[in-house]
Swiss-Prot record:
This is Uncharacterized transporter bbp_532. The chain crosses the membrane at residues 25-47, 62-81, 88-110, 114-136, 143-165, 175-197, 229-251, 256-278, 290-307, 311-330, 350-372, 376-398. The keyword Membrane applies. It is a multi-pass membrane protein. Keywords: Cell membrane, Membrane, Transmembrane, Transmembrane helix, Transport. Belongs to the major facilitator superfamily. It is found in: Cell membrane. Coiled coil: none annotated. It comes from the Bacteria.
């Protein structure tokens, strides 16, 4: 099988240049558009349950359908970007996702909502699969970890604003108007993204070959380091989505009885990722990645344990610690994937993110069974079990040199 190898003679983007500023702003907008449209339904799952007479596991399908289709789409959009270019794939994805979100806001049956949410996820796969590949190709290696950390920070802010605005508009207007507003912001972000993002200078096109995609998928999973990182992504995102899918159900019920807008404000916790993601990028320049990853996973476990308290302030502390650990761990694994992949970076990133979002879909809905039977304790046991598996994987990764 022929694989594309990238030349070391590249025209990288350096920190402090105009191009660096444009890329930073463009990817912040892409992150906002992607994660606001993807996660705008998460804080209003309770409203879906109420309006369509659904249990929490059924309501979570509005998010799981999107992340499942995003995972599936990334198997093809990454290789597609290897063929036709990074910018065209990302730009098309942003416009299509904003259109699908607008259509979703006008649906009046649960089945049609799920269908449009699935299409939204499929559209967004083009951004999620290609963004880190663009950065790893265009940014100078000395600022790659920092740039990926900033990109993830932008995703964090986008996810926060999408969730908060969705909650706010849903409480004072309706969830339909909330989604319409999100779609308008996403469309505006897409226009600015196209204008700001520089064309790839280090991109080398390779023909699209579906047979090679399948063979490369198998080839990457046989790599002892990459395969563990792929499964790590599944655990990380699955645990994160599970926690925040069901914490709203807990806090909106007795003994807390928090309002919809207040639940949405919990999304501000995600802003801890603005700090923890770049910091993790700095730490892995000084210490072994496996060590930092293990510490981040341990933080997540302690965060879940703290949320067992029936005091709102302590629950917020636990959620914050959990989120900080998650974004640090995601930053480490994202950088790790980029550095381990020396060939066909778009395909490698796609496989990692396929695992990442597939974990979100499976964990996010399947864990609803634990909520139905054991409420918050069941959710916590579910998450901690998989995070412990993640720590075991991280320890195994320490046996490899330079990791």
């Amino acid at each position: 099988m022929q694989l594309k190898i990238y030349s070391s003679n590249k025209n990288y983007i350096q920190r402090g240049t105009k191009a660096f500023t444009e890329v930073t702003i463009a990817f912040f907008l892409a992150g906002f558009s992607t994660f606001s449209t993807l996660y705008c339904v998460q804080p209003i799952l309770f409203l879906f349950s109420k309006e369509f007479s659904l249990n929490p596991a059924q309501s979570s399908l509005s998010l799981s359908a999107s992340t499942a289709m995003m995972a599936f789409g990334m198997l093809f959009t990454g290789p597609l970007s290897d063929s036709i270019g990074r910018k065209v794939v990302m730009s098309s994805s942003l416009f299509l996702a904003s259109f699908c979100t607008f259509c979703c806001s006008n649906m009046n049956s649960w089945e049609s909502i799920i269908f449009m949410r699935a299409l939204t996820g499929l559209a967004l796969s083009g951004v999620a699969a290609v963004a880190m590949t663009y950065l790893s190709e265009e940014m100078h290696p000395s600022v790659l970890s920092f740039s990926i950390g900033l990109y993830i920070s932008g995703n964090t802010i986008g996810g926060f604003l999408g969730r908060f605005l969705s909650s706010l508009f849903s409480e004072y207007f309706s969830w339909n108007i909330a989604l319409e507003f999100i779609s308008f912001l996403a469309f505006t972000s897409a226009v600015l993204f196209v204008y700001l993002l520089p064309k790839s200078k280090n991109f080398c096109s390779s023909p699209l070959d579906l047979r090679k995609i399948l063979l490369y998928f198998i080839f990457q999973w046989r790599d002892p380091v990459l395969s563990k990182l792929f499964f790590m992504g599944c655990i990380l995102m699955g645990s994160f989505i599970t926690l925040f899918n069901y914490v709203g159900y807990r806090l909106i019920s007795q003994p807390f009885f928090l309002g919809q807008t207040t639940i949405g404000l919990l999304s501000i916790i995600y802003l801890i990722g603005v700090y923890s993601s770049p910091q993790a990028g700095v730490l892995i320049e000084r210490y072994r990645k496996g060590v930092i990853l293990t510490l981040a996973l341990t933080m997540m476990i302690f965060g879940v344990l703290i949320t067992q308290c029936n005091i709102v302030l302590l629950i917020i502390v636990g959620l914050t610690l959990f989120a900080a650990g998650f974004f640090a761990a995601h930053s480490v694994t994202s950088t790790w994937i980029s550095q381990c992949s020396k060939i066909n970076k778009g395909s490698t990133s796609s496989i990692y993110l396929f695992s990442y979002y597939l974990g979100s879909s499976i964990f996010g809905t399947f864990s609803g069974i634990f909520w139905i039977t054991e409420k918050w304790l069941g959710i916590s046991i579910f998450i901690i079990t998989f995070l412990c598996i993640g720590i075991l994987l991280s320890i195994r990764l320490l046996q490899y040199k330079n990791i």
